[in-house]
């Protein structure tokens, strides 16, 4: 009788254990599937943003990029909806920052303004800040391109945005809650200082060339 009770109890345990085992297997299988989808979409967004940034540098057509920006923003919203497990939230960082960087470059180049955080309510606060830090390096590329074309007005316009972004970035010193904040501040400072030096040299050369041109005109009129 005692053995029979034990046997019945063991069978019941096995039934319960199998039910729980099936649940746990399904739970982890679903979690792994979500993780794979997040990683795939994250890589896709990052790749799209990198390609978009390269194209923005080379183009003067504002309307060319609107559809792609909207497409990427929808992908990010989908990515956000997938990150239902707390441990997956970290996967949002890179794609969100890359999007902020691409959108900021676009708006600075074509609209002469920086996107506000309120406009990007699907972007985490930390990623908005770090994305703006990254665009400083892209603005340096625009400064250098403007120098090649002797466009002093554009050089000064882009550099002013670089300064404004750096000042904005330096308002934050929450290094224990925002990963890479200090590193990006240091990188931004270095880019700003290097670009300032390049601009000083550019203006000096521009003035020298203008002076030589006036001298040549004067000599030709004698």
From Swiss-Prot:
Gene Ontology MF, one: sequence-specific DNA binding
CDD domains from the UniProt entry: TRAX
SUPFAM superfamilies: Translin
Pfam family for this entry, one: Translin
InterPro entries membership: Translin_fam (IPR002848), Translin_sf (IPR036081)
GO cellular component, one term: cytoplasm
Name of the molecule in the record: Uncharacterized protein MJ0175
Annotated organism of origin: Methanocaldococcus jannaschii (strain ATCC 43067 / DSM 2661 / JAL-1 / JCM 10045 / NBRC 100440)
């Amino acid at each position: 009788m005692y053995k029979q009770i034990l046997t019945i109890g063991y069978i019941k345990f096995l039934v319960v254990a199998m039910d729980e085992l099936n649940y746990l297997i399904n739970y982890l299988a679903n979690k792994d599937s979500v993780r794979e989808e997040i990683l795939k979409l994250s890589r896709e967004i990052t790749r799209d943003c990198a390609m978009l940034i390269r194209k923005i540098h080379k183009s003067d057509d504002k309307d060319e990029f609107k559809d792609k920006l909207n497409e990427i923003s929808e992908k990010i919203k989908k990515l956000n909806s997938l990150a239902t497990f707390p441990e997956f939230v970290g996967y949002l960082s890179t794609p969100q920052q890359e999007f902020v960087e691409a959108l900021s470059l676009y708006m600075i180049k074509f609209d002469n303004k920086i996107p506000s955080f309120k406009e990007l309510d699907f972007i985490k606060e930390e990623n908005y800040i770090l994305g703006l830090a990254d665009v400083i390096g892209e603005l340096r590329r625009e400064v250098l391109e403007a120098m090649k074309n002797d466009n002093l007005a554009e050089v000064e316009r882009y550099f002013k945005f670089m300064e404004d972004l750096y000042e904005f970035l330096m308002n934050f010193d929450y290094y224990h809650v925002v990963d890479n904040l200090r590193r990006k501040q240091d990188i931004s400072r270095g880019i700003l200082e290097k670009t300032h030096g390049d601009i000083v040299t550019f203006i000096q050369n521009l003035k020298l060339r203008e002076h030589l041109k006036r001298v040549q005109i004067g000599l030709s009129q004698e």
